[in-house]
Each structure stands twice: as C-alpha cells, then as structure tokens.
Amino acid sequence: MKKKSKIAICGFNLESNRFAPTCAESDFRENMFFVDQEISDEARKDSPAIHLGVKGFYSEMNKLFGHDDNWIDVPTMVIGSCPAGPVEEAFFNEFLEQLRLKLLAAGPLDGVYICQHGAAVATHTHDPDGIMFDLVRRVVGDETPIVATLDLHANISELMTSAVDVLVGYRTNPHVDMFDRGVEAASVLREMLDGMQPKKYTIKLPLVAPSVTQLTAKGFPYGDLIRYGQEFLDEDIFNVTILSGFAFGDTPKNGMTIIVHSRSTVENAVVVAEKLAVSAWTDRTRYLPRMTSLEKAIGLAQQAQHSAEDAPFLFADPADNPGGGGRGNTTYILEAFIAAGIKNCVFSVFYDVAAVELACKSGVNSEIEITLNSQETNEYLSLIHI
C-alpha cells in the first residue's frame, strides 16, 4: 500500500506599515487565528473565515489525491491580522515557538504549505517572514518540499527565497485570485512529491512602486508586466511571480521582485527573469504617481455641486489607507472641504471609536456635534470639531 503524503499547513499574515501603531496578539485574534484541526475544519467550509489560499490548497489536494482520506493534513497555525504596524516581538517569538513545537510533534513530514502575506515587519527585525520560513526549513530538513503563497505586496528577502522551494505570488490587485494561488501551490507540491525538483531565479529591482500604481487592470504598468510574465509559461517554466512590494514597510528588502521557477535548469529561469527585469525597468517612469492636489480636488467638488452633468467624485487620502496599515483618520480633505464651503457630500470612511459610540447613543436621523480624533494623537492627526 502506497504511503500517504503527510503535509503541514501553516501561515502568518501581516502587512506592516512602519508608521502605524504596533500590532499585538489581539489584532490577530480579532481577524484570523486558527490552530490545529480548526484550520482543516474551516478550510473545508463553503464560506470560510480562513484565508482563501488555504481553502484553495485543501480543495486541490483533495482532487489531486482523489479524496481527503488519501493524504494526511497536519494543520498547525494559520493566523493573520488586518494591515497594521510592526508586530510585537514577544508575540511573534511566542508564535514561532508554538509553530516549531507543532511541526516537531508532527514527526517526519513529506511537505509543507505556507500561506503567507510576506510584508510583515516586527519591532525587532525587518524580516519576520524570512525568520519564520527559515524556522520551518530547519525543522523539516533540506529535502522536504516547501511551497508558499504570497501577497503581491510582499517584500522579499534572500532568507525567504533560500528557505522555500517555490514562492507563488498573487497576480491580481485587488486580490481576487487567492483561492487560485492556493490551488496552484497544491499542484506544485504534488509535482514535487512525485519527484520534480524546481529551480528558481530571483531578481530584485531598485524600484519601489507607489501603491496607487499597482493595480493589475489593463493599462497599468504592473498589470501589463504580470501578463507579460505569464506569456513565458510552458512545459519548463511553471511559475512566474512578480511582487511589487509594499512601500510603507520601509525596509531594506523593499523593491519589486521577480521570481521565475523552472522544472529543469536555473539557466532557463535566468533568461526569463532578465527579460522581465529589463521590461520593468524600461517602464519605470510609468510608476510615477499622478495625484490630485487638494486645491484641484476642491475645484472639482465645487464644479460638481453646481453642475448636475458632472459625474460624482470620490476623493481619498491613499497614504491613510486602512487596507495598507493606515489608521483611516486623517482630516486633511475634510478640513479643506469645510473651509471651502463644499456642500452635499458624504464623509466616509473614518476610524474614531468615540465618534461611533456617540452616534450609536444618539440614534438614527439624529444630529450631533463631535470632535474627531479626540482619543488618539500622533503627528499625522489633528482635532476637528463638526
């Protein structure tokens, strides 16, 4: 009887904004914190609360092996926070120790799937992702296949690439292919279990693309580059991952990273990676942000409120994006619009616990006076009474 493959599943998901408040254990527990059998149970639900990459991995593994009884899943820890600041050292070290003990207790493993974001920063290190990858490698040994999925905003270190055999990055922003990348990770891992020994080559460019230039729709440079990369897929080149990185991580490992995987030789991966690097660098001026000044925004808003023919406008402060670790509570646009007398506009989304509590107490359709940012202070905030 053929031996069943024993596969560990783990993951640490955090996109760290260097300029945001630190991230604690409570931030992970509020968002995604699954251990042991909870991981498998959640991944097999129709609408899971766990990362969709994990669901995709389980789904494809069951298909590839015929049934979930034909492979042995070893769920350990899959945790994740909403984008936030650097993770606290004590909690991260505790996570690493728990993960290490769970992997050791699992005994000899045939493979590991890591569902990771890849842009974490800790209060004590620029590279918690690399430290975790290296820990997994040291526990399972050099011969055990390890495949990781990554957010396309991942900031890649040499430790990350050396510790893991295959790095599979998202190809969409907004991210709608997390499930698919989990499926791909399972497919690659199955090939490795059957004897495929992947070779990869990595190029990091001195190019830190602003987040507003990283959409993957047609006409955006990053999307065009990703689609160009997929044209090289064939019987030998099985994965091309292009990670734009996350500027607000503010680490030495920032920069666009191109990773090409080959089934046969690293030389084949080098050829493709260099072509993509040349294309990205040639297009570097396309990544210059084209922002709207506050003055122009006021003018557009004034124009719109006096002309029914003008389409509605949406103005946002992208540097304060909660999806990128911002707090969602800067008031620059609000203050400018109030000073300019802009009317008939909706103000949203704003993070202020005290304001929410007061609004809830006052009830629907009530009018209230509030002071925004009354309970939080930092150099980017100001109090404003409305």
Regions found by a protein language model. Name each.
Residues 384-386:
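Conserved small/polar residues in nucleotide/adenosyl-binding loops
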Residues 2-60:
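N-terminal amphipathic/basic leader segments beginning at the initiator methionine
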Residues 8-15, 19, 29, 83, ...:
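Active-site histidine-anchored catalytic micro-motif
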